[in-house]
Each structure stands twice: as C-alpha cells, then as structure tokens.
Amino acid sequence: MKDLKDDELPKTYKGIYAMHKYWSKKPYNLVADYIERFSSPGDIVLDSFCGSGVTVVESVRLGRRAIGIDINPVAIFITRMGLSHIDIRDLRYTFANLKMEMQPIIDQLYHTECLNCRNPNAIVTHTIWEEDNPKEVWYRCPRCRTRKAIKEASQKDAKAALEPTNTLQWAPLTQLVENSRVNVKAGMHVSDLFTKRALVGLSLLLERIEQVQDQEIKSVLKFCFTGALPQASNMVFVIRRRGKQGGEQKAGKAEVGSWVIGYWVPSEHFEINVWRCFENRFKRILRGKREINQVIPTSAIQCSNFEQLDQVEQGYWIKTGTATSLKIPSGTVGYVFVDPPHGNRMPYLELSLMWNSWLRFESNWEEEIVISASPERQKDEEDYRKRLAAAFGEIWRVLGDNRYASIVFNSLSDDTWLSLLNSCLGTGFEIVDIQPLDYSAHSVIQDTRKQALKTDLVITCQKQIPKQARRIRFNGSELELERKLSDYLVHHPEGAETYQILNALLVSSIPTGSIYRVSSILDTLEDKFKFAQGRWCLESKG
C-alpha cells in the first residue's frame, strides 16, 4: 500500500474529462492516486456507481482491469466514450461532410438582416430572451465579414425564433419528473427546455447523425450531440457584470453563462445557434479522443461479462445495472473506489432525463439509490438506507479478503451520514483512513452559500476477516462539541470556512464510533461563534 500524494492539487477537467458534462466528477489525478495506493497492475478495480467513468478510465490507464456499473444509461454511454479508440482521420472526414450538408440547413433557421450591409442572410449566433420573447440578437455576416454585431430583435427575428419554417422531425415528448429541488414543475416536458427553433435544428441534426454508417463514428457524433444539448437549451443564463455609469449602477454587457444543476430556465436566457453548439462541442471531443488514443492501451479489451474480463490481461467491463446485485463472483475484486449518491444532493436519473430521452434510453427508476423530493417517487430516507446497505453488502462480497474500498461522500443531513456509515460498518468493513477530497471546480452555489460543501471525504475501509459488524451513533454532548469547536478555531486564528470545520470534526470523530450531528455543529457555530467575510472565528457573538 503506497502513500497518497498529500500535496497534490486537483487538476481541472480537460481532454477526456472535458468532453461531456456530468455531475460530481472527481479530480482524475486524485482518483488515480487512490488506485495506485490501494491496488496493483492487473488487479480488478470496481466502481459500482461509476457515473462518467473517472475510476474506470484511470484504472485502465494505470494497467488495471476495470468494472464500471451504473444505473444511469447515459453514464455508461459517457464512460464508454471515455475509453473507446477512434480513427481521428475518419471522424474528422465524417464531421466535415456533416458540416457541409447540415450547417447551411440549420443556419437557415437563424437568418437575420445585417445592419451594416443589409444582407438578409446574416447568421444569428445568439439570441437573448426575456421570458418568452426574443429581445437581443448577436449575429455574424458572411457578406461584409462582420464577425459579431448586436441589435435589438425585430418582429421578423421574433417570428423566425417562434415559428420556424422547417418541420420538426422528431423530439422527445418525455415528461420531466416533478421536483422543486431541480426546478421542475408538474407537467413540464423535455421539449420545454428548448425554443421551437432549437428543437427543429436539433431534430434535423440528430436525424442526419442516425444515417451515419460507421457505428463507432455515429456513437461519437451522438455523444457530441448530447454534449451540446445544455448550451443549446434555454438554461444558459445571461451574465451581466454591473458597473457605474454617470454615477449610477448599470447592468453591463451580456456574457454567456452555462447550464447549472437542475432544470432552471432563467427569465433572461440565451438561445445559441444549434450548429454553433454542436461544432464547439466537437472540438472538445476531438481533443478528448486524441488523448484516449494516446493514454488508453490498445490492448485493453472491452469485455461483455466478468468471465471474459477474468481471462484477459488488460480490459474493462462496463454495463448499465444496479449496485445492489453485482454479477461478479465473490472475492474476485482487488480494489473498489465508489462515489455513491449523497442522499438528496443529486437525483441523477431525473437530471439525466434530458440526455436519456434524446438518446431514447429507458431508465430503471425503481432501483435508483437516492433520496428524491419528487412527489411522483417513493424515494425516502428508508428506501435509500436499505438500498445503500445492500450495495455495500455486494461490495464486501466481491472484494478480496483484506482488500480495500474507498467511498467518496459528504452531506449536510444527519440521517444520510448515519445511513452511509452504518451501511459501511454494518457490512463488516473497518475504516482505516479518512481524507478530504477537493473538487476540480466549484459551482456558483459552492462559492457563495454559507453552508456550502466545498470538498468531499474519502472514507477508505478494509474488508475484515472474520466479519465484524459495527455501528456508529450520534454524540449528544453540546458542551464537548462547543469545546472542540473552540479548540479548532484557537488553532486557526485566521478563521475557517464551514466545510473546513465539518471536515475536521467528521475526520476526527468517525473512527471513534461516535459522530456529532452536522445540524448540531451548524447550530452551535451560529449560536456561539462569529461569522465574518466567509469565515467562522473565535470572537464571541456578543
């Protein structure tokens, strides 16, 4: 067992990991450190909540055999795209033909008049909407070579956006799952996330992609299509940096934002030209595919079952499935690195419905391990606890004796923390290491919210033989908690952010078998300590 590289910082998402958006991606370089520490080349590494495939990709890159399982079909699609080689020349050739044919067709949906040369066929690149009305148009003009001009949307521009002349080929009619936490109201559909013009452009593009003969290249182009969907939607917010003009605060020029978590459609939002979204995403995917061709061994075989994986020296097996019933023989896995759903933080299937519906993927809603606020689903704390315990039971079963499993987790919920820890310890694992795991990038919410979780914790456990089940309980001593908080802040005179304090107390208390309630920590901080400039300090509130 090697030492972790304590001073290594999380690297940003680039190359392979910048090809497609997915939530809760972990820093690939730090995941690689854990794989190198707790496994050896040739070992089988399992991630039964594999998401976008960081664990699987890094395991294969490091000479391990890998198993990636996820209940979300688009997650497995993304993972496969992060592993599969492609002929770059053929891919570029197919894209060039696609561009030659489809860009003019799609751009016809975005024709506007150039104010400089009066060309009626200038191309709209961006439209700013206020609620249901286009207000501002950004365009380029091939005739006078204007690269970017901005004008107020005319009635003709509004009609082009609201009543596209081309026929809608096919678009998903899928109804989104009602859930206020992810901004979905009852009766909302996937199609509500796009303008009518964008739906037409996307439908034309997808219809043409489906006609590509080479199946691998078709898959990459569909991957590019789903990767482009967020920026082609109405969920791209407008950034306006405020400044003073004539002594008054004025909203600045508009800048392009991005899709944040959930299906929030801002009152002021962008509509971006569909082809522009697709081509920009293709450039990212091309860079990622070049890297895959370089770092993923050509000898790594894509296997269709465990038996095949067990016979090869290098390979991977990825499949859509549930973590509660692994089709893996007992004691055959060398290391596990998993990032299970953190209670109610991220309803993955609900958030992926936009992608899955365009790809016509069906989802197994019943067996998802999650707590959801949706009134349409029976996904409460009890269901989460039972399924999580079953998933850890399967991890314990397939893991080799005295081998290790690392679990990434964090939550502001007391019950969710207790469910996670007791699912783990109750299975028979012994906790041997707890370390914070920084994120590669922080969201707007993480940067601004007082109680934002800015890291996760990696809890590494060892499979005990003989099996010894334990349980964790809550420590209810308020005086002891206040003393520990005071001691921590004495040693941090510059103050500390909420997540730093939570990390310190959880890391120190979990191995003792008794943890403080997260809610009690937060309440005690509010009652007994001062919060200033984003940090808690020792000075009393009086």
PLM regions and their residue ranges:
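Conserved SAM-binding loop of SAM-dependent methyltransferases across substrates and taxa
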Residues: 54-63
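Short glycine-dipeptide loop
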Residues: 41, 361-362, 394, 399-405
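Conserved beta-strand signature within the Rossmann-like core of class I S-adenosyl-L-methionine
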Residues: 365-369, 403-410
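A short acidic, leucine-rich amphipathic alpha-helix
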Residues: 497-506
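A short glycine-rich, Lys/Arg-flanked "PGG" loop and its adjoining helix->strand segment in the class I
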Residues: 385-401, 426
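Class I SAM-dependent methyltransferase "Motif I" SAM/SAH-binding loop
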Residues: 49-53
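Charged low-complexity interaction tracts in eukaryotic proteins
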Residues: 471-474, 513-542
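Nucleic-acid modification enzymes, centered on SAM-dependent nucleic-acid methyltransferases
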Residues: 1-46, 62-329, 345-377, 391, ...
